[in-house]
């Protein structure tokens, strides 16, 4: 992954609009870049395939957004990007990473659980949806600040022997 730039916003926005029912706006991405959030893109052959936005706050961070192009989903790209963002947070000495996800997003919930995130709570009626609203599940991943990086050994949620 590499740092997202203003020149990437159109491609990132296209992915966001294609995969999210209630997507971020161009302004949301520009604001994230302007506020110094950690914004990354994954590209292959000059084509952006995914993105992630992490907001650091003191010794914690919040994963604000992560998206994978529709044609690239279910190939491990989301997991790889999530791991890289956790690695970035770890290198910045963050103690934990928070996120929130729609209660109906079973694929994302499974990815986050298998990557070491645990349920923290529920925000009732947090997201808009076709029937009005739905809950957000808040999750946290505790990052251990040991001498080795998480990916050098075992990631949270993984067994030592795979």
Functional labels for PLM-detected ranges:
Residues 68, 102-103:
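Short amphipathic helical patch at the helix-1/turn junction of helix-turn-helix
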Residues 82, 105-108, 125-130:
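Short glycine/proline-centered loop/turn elements that form peptide/ligand docking sites
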Residues 89-100, 111:
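Conserved GNAT acetyl-CoA-binding A-motif
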Residues 98-100, 118-135:
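Conserved catalytic-core motifs of GNAT/GCN5-like acyltransferases
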